[in-house]
Amino acid sequence: PSPTRRSKSRSKSRSRSRSASAGKAAKRAKSKTAK
C-alpha cells in the first residue's frame, strides 16, 4: 500500500501544478483580450 500511496500523492501534485498552469494561461489570455 505504501507504493500506491506514493503514486497517489505524485499524481495529486501533478494535477495541482497542471491546474495552476491552466489558471495562469487563462489569466494571460484574459489580460490579452482586455488590452
From Swiss-Prot:
Span list, region Disordered: 1-35
Example of a GO cellular component annotation carried by this entry: nucleus
Organism: Mytilus californianus
Protein name stated in the entry: Sperm-specific protein Phi-1
Cellular location(s): Nucleus; Chromosome
Domain of life of the organism encoding this protein: Eukaryota
One Gene Ontology term of the molecular function aspect: DNA binding
Extent of Basic residues compositional bias: 1-17, 25-35
Function: Involved in nuclear basic protein transition: histones are replaced by spermatid specific proteins which are themselves replaced by protamines in late spermatids.
Any one Gene Ontology BP term: cell differentiation
Positions of transmembrane segments: none
The entry's keywords: Chromosome, Developmental protein, Differentiation, DNA-binding, Nucleosome core, Nucleus, Spermatogenesis
Tissue expression as described in the entry: Sperm.
